């Protein structure tokens, strides 16, 4: 009968490095990126938005005509080899106007969301961290602004400032400030009593340093998600203001304005309405897909 001998224990040498699979720290941002890559809808949305960004950048290379160039002899011509998306009631090439309109829509989305993000995040940080009467004052202002439908408040602001694309951009930024503000405020309130914040205060760290070095970095996930979703909302609101004649003015190729100018030809020349409307739908859908994917990746608790 064979006797089994116990295998000797392998003790690591004092200076030997730990195994490769031990103490492996995975960055939460890297893990979120991995989850995002697995989300097929988010990838589709990213492809859509990237396509429109490239179209906006290389607009002069995609078409040789001007978006304001008129040709009455080509009035309301259907899609053809010469005019891919047809022409409008002034004989202007709709494809050219769609391409240059992508620039306007993306610029409005970027600047409106950036403005709302900066002011909303700042106010949310102040209200959530300091609390007391400062929080009460800022929160009441947010509540009053959110009591009105965003598009109605934007219309009122543009009516005061005057109809133009710049004023529409300002109005869209203003109506989105409380959305970012309340989001950041709620996140700050949940963080300010955490142990690492209390430890920073105990070490004598100044409030500004605590806010920007500890609280803000830990609040980035919901801010990024809201900013992505806000892009689509801002573009849709700009199109609505343009449709009402309060946004971009002729001859600027803003998609909402194109819809407004062509609504009387919806039966006789449906292409004049179809392509601008389809462009708005695609861009908004693309940003919503990316936003939903980011939300699921950065905050799995919110996954429905």
Curated annotation (Swiss-Prot):
GO terms for biological process: peptide transport; protein transport; transmembrane transport. GO terms for cellular component: plasma membrane. CDD domains: TM_PBP2. Gene3D superfamilies: MetI-like (1.10.3720.10). InterPro entries: ABC_transport_permease, BP-dependent_transpt_permease, MetI-like, MetI-like_sf, OppC_N. It is found in: Cell membrane. Its main location: membrane. Keywords: Cell membrane, Membrane, Peptide transport, Protein transport, Transmembrane, Transmembrane helix, Transport. Residues 102-291 form the ABC transmembrane type-1 domain. It is a multi-pass membrane protein. The chain crosses the membrane at residues 41-61, 108-128, 141-161, 164-184, 227-247, 271-291. Residues 1-24 are annotated as: Disordered. PANTHER family: D,D-DIPEPTIDE TRANSPORT SYSTEM PERMEASE PROTEIN DDPC-RELATED, OLIGOPEPTIDE TRANSPORT SYSTEM PERMEASE PROTEIN APPC. Belongs to the binding-protein-dependent transport system permease family. OppBC subfamily. Probably part of the ABC transporter Dpp involved in dipeptide transport. Responsible for the translocation of the substrate across the membrane. This is Dipeptide transport system permease protein DppC. It comes from Alkalihalophilus pseudofirmus (strain ATCC BAA-2126 / JCM 17055 / OF4) (Bacillus pseudofirmus). The lineage of its organism: Bacteria, Bacillati, Bacillota, Bacilli, Bacillales. The gene is dppC.
């Amino acid at each position: 009968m064979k006797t089994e001998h116990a295998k000797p224990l392998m003790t690591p040498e004092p200076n030997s490095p730990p195994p490769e699979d031990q103490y492996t720290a995975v960055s939460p941002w890297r893990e979120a990126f991995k989850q995002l890559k697995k989300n097929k809808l988010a990838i589709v949305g990213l492809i859509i938005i990237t396509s429109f960004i490239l179209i906006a950048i290389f607009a002069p290379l995609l078409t040789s005509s001007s978006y304001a160039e008129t040709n009455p002899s080509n009035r309301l011509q259907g899609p053809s080899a010469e005019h891919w998306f047809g022409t409008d009631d002034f004989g202007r090439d709709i494809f050219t106007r769609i391409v240059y309109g992508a620039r306007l829509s993306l610029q409005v989305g970027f600047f409106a969301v950036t403005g709302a993000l900066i002011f909303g995040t700042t106010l949310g940080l102040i209200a959530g961290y300091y609390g007391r009467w400062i929080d009460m004052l800022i929160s009441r202002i947010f509540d009053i602004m959110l009591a009105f439908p965003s598009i109605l408040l934007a219309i009122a602001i543009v009516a005061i400032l005057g109809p133009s694309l710049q004023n529409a951009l300002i109005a869209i930024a203003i109506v989105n400030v409380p959305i970012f503000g309340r989001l950041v405020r709620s996140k700050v309130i949940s963080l300010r009593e955490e142990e690492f914040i209390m430890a920073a205060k105990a070490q004598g760290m100044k409030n500004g340093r605590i806010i920007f070095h500890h609280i803000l970095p830990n609040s980035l996930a919901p801010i990024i998600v809201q900013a992505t979703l806000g892009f689509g909302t801002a573009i849709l609101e700009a199109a609505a203001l343009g449709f009402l004649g309060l946004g971009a003015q002729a001859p600027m190729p803003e998609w909402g304005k194109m819809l407004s100018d062509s609504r009387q030809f919806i039966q006789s020349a449906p292409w004049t309405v179809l392509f601008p409307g389809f462009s708005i739908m695609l861009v908004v859908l693309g940003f919503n897909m990316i936003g939903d994917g980011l939300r699921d990746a950065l905050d799995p608790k919110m996954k429905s």
